C-alpha cells in the first residue's frame, strides 16, 4: 500500500519514481537517498542484456541488504530485451510505464521516469501536479565538480491521468520540446575511466566505444567541449565519484 501524503503537492497524493538501471549501484543509492522524503514508491527496471546486446546477469538483488531502508517501497523489475541496440533501449524505457501500474497510481498522482543518474528535486512537483514537463538538470560530467555549459532535459513526469496514455519513449524523444523547469542534477560518466569504458560498451550509441576516457579526465574535457570546475559537489554524491 502506498502511504497517504499529508498536505500533498497540488491535487496528487502519492508520487511514483521510475528509473532504468544497468549496474550503477552508487547512482541508485544516491537517487534513493536524495528522493527519499519525496517519493512513495520507486520502480527500478533492469534488462537481461546491455543495449548493445551482450547478455548480462540479473544484478538488482545481489546487494539487497544495502537497500533495506527502501525495501518496502521498491518495485524491482527484470525485463527480457530483444531487437537492435536502440530497440532494446526503447523496450526497457517502455517497461517502466507498465511497472509503474503496479503501484496503482490514481489519476492525480505524480509519476516520473528517468535514467538512474538523472535526479530531480522538489521544484518540479507543482508543475508535475498539473501537466507533463521535463526537469532541466545541472549536468556534471566525469566528476561531480565538472559542469557542462548547458543543462540537461532529463526526468519527465506529470499526473498519471496524462502519463498513462503517453508512449514514454516518445516523450523521451521529444523532451527538448516539453515545458522545462530547472531542477536537480544529471551526473553522468562518473566513477573513473574503467566505469566509463564499461558504460560505453553497453549503451545504445556506439560512438563512445573508442573514446580515450583517461585523456578526457586528465584534460578536464568532454568529447565535444571543455568542462568547468565549479568547485561544488551535489549533496550526497558518492565519495567514489
Language model features: what each stretch is:
Residues 36-88:
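Acidic donor-binding segment of Leloir-type glycosyltransferases
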Residues 2-4, 78, 83-101, 109, ...:
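Catalytic-site signature of metal-activated, phosphate-bearing donor transferases
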Residues 38, 106-107:
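Short loop/turn motifs at secondary-structure junctions
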Residues 31-33, 56-59, 126-129:
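Short, glycine/charged-enriched secondary-structure capping and boundary segments
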Residues 14-16, 41, 110:
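Structural motif
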Residues 8, 62-73, 168-178:
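Short, conserved catalytic or adaptor-binding loops enriched in Gly and charged residues
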Residues 1-37:
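N-proximal low-complexity "stem/linker" segments adjacent to membrane-targeting elements
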Residues 22-25, 50-51, 117-120:
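Short acidic, S/G/P-rich loop/turn micro-motifs used as interaction or catalytic elements
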